[in-house]
C-alpha cells in the first residue's frame, strides 16, 4: 500500500502541522504493515504557480512548448501521477491568513485536471479520484471550528473539503490543532488533543 506524505508549512521544525503529519505517518505505519511512504515537502521544494504558457501547452493539439514549459509540463504530470498512485494521502495544511499556503495551492492546481481527476457528464461533475484515503493535518492559531465566532473565516478546511470532494474524495479525515496562538497552555492542549485523535486512527 502506497502513502503520499505532503508537508506545506514554511516553519520547519517549529511547524505544528509537520509535527502532526509525522505522528500520523508513524501511527499508520504501526497499524498498516509494509506501508510504502513517499514524502514531498512543498516548502523546501516549492512548485511554480500556474502560468498561461503552461495552461496553453496543456491543451490538446498545442504546439511543442519551449524547453522551460516542457519541463514544467513534465513536473506537473509527475505530481499528478504520484498522487494517483497513492492509496493514502496525508497532507499538512496550516492556515495562513484564513486559507491554505500558496505552496499547497500550487500542488492542488496540479491535481485538479479535467479528464484526469474530474469530468463533466450529463450536466454534472463527476470526480474521478475517489477510492483513496485522505487525512489532513490542520493547524491554526485561532479557533474556527463550527459554532466558533470566527467560523465564517475558515477558508482552509472548507476549501480542502470542497476541492477534494470535487475530484471524488468525499470522506476527508481532519486531525486539527487550533487555538495555537492563545497561549502556551492552549497550544499544549490543542497538540495533545490532536495527538490523541491520531492514536485513534485505524488501518485503511
From Swiss-Prot:
The keyword Flavoprotein applies. FMN binds at residues 9, 15-17, 95-98, 139-142. Its cofactor is FMN. Quinone reductase that provides resistance to thiol-specific stress caused by electrophilic quinones. Also exhibits azoreductase activity. Catalyzes the reductive cleavage of the azo bond in aromatic azo compounds to the corresponding amines. It is an enzyme of class 1 (oxidoreductase). Belongs to the azoreductase type 1 family. Signal peptide: none annotated. It catalyses: 2 a quinone + NADH + H(+) = 2 a 1,4-benzosemiquinone + NAD(+); N,N-dimethyl-1,4-phenylenediamine + anthranilate + 2 NAD(+) = 2-(4-dimethylaminophenyl)diazenylbenzoate + 2 NADH + 2 H(+). Coiled coil: none annotated. It comes from Methylocella silvestris (strain DSM 15510 / CIP 108128 / LMG 27833 / NCIMB 13906 / BL2). Keywords: Flavoprotein, FMN, NAD, Oxidoreductase. Its EC number is 1.6.5.-, 1.7.1.17. This is FMN-dependent NADH:quinone oxidoreductase. It comes from the Bacteria. One of its GO terms (molecular function) is oxidoreductase activity, acting on NAD(P)H as acceptor.
